[in-house]
A protein has these predicted regions:
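Short, high-confidence coil segments that cap the C-terminus of an alpha-helix
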Residues: 17, 45, 120, 166-167, ...
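Conserved alpha/beta core of the MobA/IspD/sugar-nucleotide pyrophosphorylase nucleotidyltransferase superfamily
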Residues: 219, 223-269
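Conserved N-terminal catalytic core of the sugar/cofactor nucleotidyltransferase
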Residues: 110-168, 182
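ATP-dependent small-molecule kinase phosphotransfer cores
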Residues: 1-16
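Short, glycine-/small-residue-rich phosphate/pyrophosphate-handling segment
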Residues: 58-70, 207, 211-237
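Conserved beta-loop-beta/alpha segment of the NTase-like Rossmann-fold superfamily
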Residues: 151-219
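N-terminal glycine-rich phosphate-binding loop and ensuing alpha1 helix
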Residues: 81-130
Length: 269
């Protein structure tokens, strides 16, 4: 490492590529003073993609805790996150249960159910619709059927169900069929790297859902005023908000009316 490894790292400074990949850094590499310094120098001039072992060694801790590092734990990349799928809309403007409406051959809610698979420690679909309950049971997805009328009830019930088991919670509407799984994954990775912030999706200046709240906000969310939603908590803590930009504005569009459905179907073609 003192000779060939260090020389290679120095040569990377003069490549035209902005990105350098190093696989991997562990006990042997961290014992070389010259190698450690070469890594530090390279970090100042290039974008590095590094695989770093979890050993509790000073240099490895330094790399993992560096202020400019975006850290992904390959054993648990999304952290201890839960998800509440909001599926209790009355569908008044739609003229019926919009979540069962056909969208490219699938019930509308299926797109949200597919997104959450293999991402969360635990999840629950909160709904007033028995048809949605049956659909979730068939897919082995936890579901809570209730009869409460308001958004604050839905949030409270969801957190009462899973809040004790998670460090943060995603609130995912069930009517955004063009939201991409890659966007959800990116949002989760951001929240795992900055665990103290409320994370939400955006497109330019337009903010939207899903939203991730750290556990410290659960009590406030469970005690929302009648008919109020998570936006009240967001507005109470503007200094704690961070956003992740999606690649397409249509990812943030929800469906409230048959015309909304038609427009998104046309866009999806």
């Amino acid at each position: 490492f003192d000779e060939k490894g260090t020389a290679f790292l120095h040569s990377c400074l003069h490549t035209t590529s902005e990105w350098i990949t190093i696989d991997e850094i562990g006990f042997l590499e961290s014992n070389s003073c010259k190698y450690r310094q070469a890594i530090r120098t390279l970090m100042k001039h290039k974008q590095l993609l590094m695989v770093v072992r979890k050993q509790k060694l000073p240099f490895l801790e330094e790399l993992r805790n560096h202020k400019d590092v975006f850290l992904v734990d390959l054993d648990q990349p999304y952290g201890n996150a839960g998800c509440i799928i909001m599926a209790s809309g009355q569908g008044t403007r739609f003229g019926g249960n919009k979540l069962l409406a056909d969208f490219n051959g699938q019930p509308l809610i299926d797109f949200s159910l597919n997104i959450i698979k293999n991402l969360f420690t635990t999840c629950v679909v909160v709904t007033i619709h028995r048809e949605i309950q049956s659909l979730c049971i068939k897919q082995n997805i936890p579901v809570l059927l209730h009869t409460f009328p308001h958004r604050n009830d839905m949030i409270r019930l969801g957190l009462e169900t899973i809040g004790d088991y998670i460090d943060r919670c995603v609130f995912l509407p069930a009517d955004q069929p063009l939201l991409q799984k890659e966007s959800m994954i990116s949002l989760l990775l951001c929240a795992e790297n900055d665990r103290n912030s409320i994370w939400r999706t955006c497109y330019g200046d337009i903010v939207g859902s899903p939203v991730i709240f750290p556990a410290e906000f659960f009590e406030e969310l469970q005690n929302l005023p009648l008919r109020k939603g998570g936006s009240l908590v967001i507005n109470n803590h503007p200094d704690r908000i961070r956003t992740f930009s999606v690649s397409d504005i249509n990812e943030l569009r929800d469906i409230d009316t048959p015309d909304d459905l038609s427009q998104l179907l046309h866009r999806n073609l």
